[in-house]
Amino acid sequence: MTLEKILREKKKDKDILLMTHIVLGYPSFAANREVIEQMVKNGVDCIEMQIPFSEPMADGPVILKANQESLARGTRVAQCFDFAREMTRKHQIPFLFMTYYNIVFKYGEERFFQDAKEAGIKGLIVPDLPPEMGEDYFAYAEQYQLAPIIIYAPTSTPERMKTLAGSATGFIYCAARRGVTGNNSALDENFDNYLSNCRAATTLPLAVGFGIKSKADVQALIGKADMAVIGSQTIRLVDENGPKAVGPFVASLR
């Protein structure tokens, strides 16, 4: 079943879906394993697993630090594929890879898609690769039936959104704020108008992330988006209180 179909099926029984984010190898793969267990047990619908990169341009300080520390501890792309294979076999929810194009390019584009497919991954988020620059990438995404997730930003024009939607499957990731992940700024006054533009540009489900960290944030998206994305906040929790803090937090979000 495609990622879009899985999410639409899940949405039938819920006001809004939850997607969470982990950085692979941070603070360790053992901790990742425990965190994912907590997330799944407490109702997360989809998990994006970030393959660490030294210069994650879309990520704020929390996720940047996690990327750098994971790399410093020796995390390799092959380990990330092995871990993904283990998780997709154990847990019956969709898993995505998130990373940057340099990782995909160095690994070999077709090989990356082949191995991701074999590992049970349902989609890919590569925020620094616009469709105009990724002809082969998007062709492989179609060939191997992995959803290439496209990101909309508050600065995206309606025309640009429609153009981007032509390359997307799975869902659209709508950045709630300008800047990087984990930002504390309030939602723009024009946020509802922005989401209306997102909805008008595509028939795909909409996920909203960047700075979503509380039940109030999630509740505010009901009726406007299909999925809320929580990233930096769960990493902060693990840093402060360990993996076991993630379960109660996720359970409190809806």
Swiss-Prot record:
The protein's annotated catalytic reaction(s) are: (1S,2R)-1-C-(indol-3-yl)glycerol 3-phosphate + L-serine = D-glyceraldehyde 3-phosphate + L-tryptophan + H2O
**Gene Ontology molecular function, alphabetical:** tryptophan synthase activity
One term under GO cellular component: cytosol
In which domain of life is the source organism classified? Bacteria
Q: Which Pfam families match?
A: Trp_syntA
Q: What does this protein do?
A: The alpha subunit is responsible for the aldol cleavage of indoleglycerol phosphate to indole and glyceraldehyde 3-phosphate.
How is the subunit organization of this protein annotated in UniProt? Tetramer of two alpha and two beta chains.
Recorded protein name is Tryptophan synthase alpha chain
